[in-house]
């Protein structure tokens, strides 16, 4: 097919959009691939839609290749299935909720575990029907609080979600592995650099969970890996290596000290090092106690104390992942006023436990470790408070930040931190949703069997932005051949009618050879055409210009920047060879 730029619905921009923060957003808008309609909501224009459809094609080919079958479920969904699974509440403000004219509650689907489970229940009732894997490529909706980076994090997005149904845990493992392998093929074909990391399941539920993260400095997900062992995990999933417990023998008794004007860790350390305690105190010797309030879905707010070494900050993402499905908030001044035993800047574990406040600590706070922490009175701290002897936590929590150089959970070396963009996620859900909806089938022995599920997502529209993020330069986009909106971009760079006829003829021959061709036949200057060819990012640019009269055309590689002249009579074969390898 030949796409003529003189007819194409396209307007390129020379300047970056004012609201664009990241390269992919800037370039996709400037190149006329997408246009913003509202925060987190974008229109796909002709060239952008082509790239999106190419990504969808690759995803479909690999899903079909593992025996998955495509269906399409509605995006407008009734409340009842999500009420049954408790996700009507668990999703909180992230759901788009609406009512019909009769007052019935509906939502715009963020994901479809419930509906797939009910669909299988309605159609299959025998072990002979299993295993089965179904998938869809569909628009999803999530009410993101802060949509950003164009189509990287939007409120409306295209996602491939698939669901496997097996009768045994071994079957689920096989389905999980098949999807994992298919995802590796998808991302490799798309030219995406990625890592696979251990992850948490969040509101999805289930056990085994891995994320596919595209390597990117602008990614919202922080992950760590151990270069020695290959261990990799999202920071929310990192397990802290706990030290061995320390014997209590010989540990001095805890002692309360006057510590005026020491409400922060820094001021406390300064005081300690001027108090002649007998050793040099660092922030790691202090115990920082953070108070939050938590609420289970449909429940009431409750206080929660969190103890971490003073040299660590609490990571909100890790804390949120540890508390799911509960939500949490920091305490307000009104909360402190209602709980006078909470002395800001001087909170210790004893008052928390004396007042029935649940107290969870970092795994590094083991029995026998001695701490400097709040004494629950203004201007007072206690030195030598020993875990397991002077206070007993209610458990541990993974809430402290993970840092470069921390020991890997597998003990093989140090962790190195990096950032990425989530492009895929695989879960072994187990029977969470088949239990909710009592999905039972007749087993081979005549008894009921409950299928076990897997859930597998790929961010299809997000992948367009990810590819743009990883494949661009200062001039514009550089699409991998697998997803490019065309195979060849032919530029008519001369007003000479002979050159124009030559370009038209070459484009027609390329079309007959089965290539997708963009032909820039506009009445614009060569400079404008060259800039647009670089901005649009088709991997091969063919220039028909002044050299045509000498029987030559120019072939430019958008990825390498290399340019070469080829004879006009051999241009067709040279271009086809370059495109098809």
Curated annotation (Swiss-Prot):
| Any one GO MF annotation of this record | proline-tRNA ligase activity
UniProt keyword annotation of Nucleus present? no
Major site of localization recorded for this protein: cytoplasm
The compartments listed are: Cytoplasm
Q: Which InterPro entries match?
A: aa-tRNA-synt_IIb, aa-tRNA-synth_II, aa-tRNA-synth_II/BPL/LPL, Anticodon-bd, Anticodon-bd_dom_sf, Pro-tRNA-ligase_IIa, Pro-tRNA-synth_IIa_bac-type, Pro-tRNA-Synthase_IIa_type1
For this record, the Gene Ontology CC terms, alphabetical, are: cytosol
Quickly give the catalysed reaction.
tRNA(Pro) + L-proline + ATP = L-prolyl-tRNA(Pro) + AMP + diphosphate
Q: Name one Pfam family in it.
A: HGTP_anticodon
Which key words tag this protein in UniProt? Aminoacyl-tRNA synthetase, ATP-binding, Cytoplasm, Ligase, Nucleotide-binding, Protein biosynthesis
Its GO biological process annotations read:
prolyl-tRNA aminoacylation
Xref: PROSITE patterns: AA_TRNA_LIGASE_II
Which PANTHER family is this protein grouped with?
MITOCHONDRIAL RIBOSOME PROTEIN L39/PROLYL-TRNA LIGASE FAMILY MEMBER, PROLINE--TRNA LIGASE
Q: Which family does it belong to?
A: Belongs to the class-II aminoacyl-tRNA synthetase family. ProS type 1 subfamily.
What does the record give as the function of this protein?
Catalyzes the attachment of proline to tRNA(Pro) in a two-step reaction: proline is first activated by ATP to form Pro-AMP and then transferred to the acceptor end of tRNA(Pro). As ProRS can inadvertently accommodate and process non-cognate amino acids such as alanine and cysteine, to avoid such errors it has two additional distinct editing activities against alanine. One activity is designated as 'pretransfer' editing and involves the tRNA(Pro)-independent hydrolysis of activated Ala-AMP.
- What information about domains appears in the record's comments? Consists of three domains: the N-terminal catalytic domain, the editing domain and the C-terminal anticodon-binding domain.
Protein name (record): Proline--tRNA ligase 1
What is the gene name? proS1
């Amino acid at each position: 097919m030949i796409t003529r730029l003189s007819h194409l619905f396209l307007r390129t921009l020379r300047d970056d959009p004012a609201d664009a923060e990241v390269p992919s957003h800037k370039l996709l808008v400037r190149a006329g691939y997408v246009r913003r309609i509202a925060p987190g909501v974008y229109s796909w224009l002709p060239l952008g839609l082509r790239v999106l459809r190419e990504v969808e094609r690759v995803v479909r080919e690999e899903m079909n290749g593992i025996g998955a079958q495509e269906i399409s479920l509605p995006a407008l969904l009734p409340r009842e299935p999500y009420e049954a699974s408790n996700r009507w509440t668990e999703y909180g403000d992230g759901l788009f909720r609406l009512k019909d004219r009769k007052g019935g509650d509906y939502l715009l689907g963020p994901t479809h575990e419930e509906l797939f489970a009910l669909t299988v229940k309605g159609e299959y009732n025998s072990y002979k029907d299993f295993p089965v894997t179904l998938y869809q490529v569909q628009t999803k909706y999530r009410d993101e609080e802060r949509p950003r980076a164009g189509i990287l994090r939007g409120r409306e997005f295209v996602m491939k979600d698939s669901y496997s149904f097996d009768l045994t845990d071994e079957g689920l493992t096989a389905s999980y592995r098949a999807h994992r392998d298919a995802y590796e093929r998808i991302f490799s074909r798309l030219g995406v650099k990625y890592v696979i990391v251990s992850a948490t399941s969040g509101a999805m539920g289930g056990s085994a969970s891995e994320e596919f993260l595209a390597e990117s400095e602008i990614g919202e997900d922080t992950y760590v890996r151990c270069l020695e062992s290959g261990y990799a995990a999202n920071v929310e999933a990192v397990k802290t290596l706990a030290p061995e417990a320390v014997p209590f023998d010989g540990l001095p008794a805890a002692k309360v000290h006057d510590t005026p004007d020491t409400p922060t860790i820094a001021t406390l350390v300064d005081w300690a090092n001027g108090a002649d305690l007998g050793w040099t105190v660092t922030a790691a010797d202090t115990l920082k106690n953070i108070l939050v309030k938590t609420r289970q879905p449909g429940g009431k707010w409750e206080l929660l104390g969190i103890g971490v070494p003073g040299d660590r900050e609490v990571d909100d993402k890790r804390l949120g992942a540890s508390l799911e499905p509960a939500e949490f908030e920091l305490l307000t001044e009104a909360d402190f006023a209602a709980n006078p035993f909470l002395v800001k800047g001087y909170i210790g574990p004893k008052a928390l436990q004396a007042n029935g406040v649940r107290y969870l600590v970092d795994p590094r706070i083991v029995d026998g470790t001695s701490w400097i922490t709040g004494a629950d009175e203004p201007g007072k701290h206690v030195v030598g408070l020993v875990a397991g002897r002077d206070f007993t936590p209610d458990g541990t929590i993974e809430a402290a930040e993970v840092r470069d150089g921390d020991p890997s959970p597998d003990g093989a070396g140090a962790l190195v931190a990096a950032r990425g963009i989530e492009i895929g996620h695989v879960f072994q859900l187990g029977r969470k949703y088949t239990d909710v909806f009592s999905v039972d089938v007749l087993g081979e022995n005549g008894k009921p069997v409950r299928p076990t599920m897997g859930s597998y997502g790929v961010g299809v529209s997000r992948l367009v932005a990810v590819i743009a993020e990883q494949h661009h330069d200062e001039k514009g986009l550089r699409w991998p051949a697998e997803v490019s909106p065309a195979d060849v971009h032919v530029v008519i760079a001369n007003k000479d009618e002979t050159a124009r006829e030559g370009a038209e003829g070459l484009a027609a021959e390329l079309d007959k050879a089965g290539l997708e061709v963009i032909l820039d036949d506009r009445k614009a200057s060569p400079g404008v055409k060259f800039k647009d060819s670089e901005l649009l990012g088709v991997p091969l640019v063919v220039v028909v210009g002044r050299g045509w009269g000498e029987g030559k055309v120019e072939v430019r590689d958008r990825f390498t920047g290399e340019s070469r002249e080829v004879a006009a009579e051999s241009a067709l074969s040279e271009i086809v060879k370059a495109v098809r390898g």
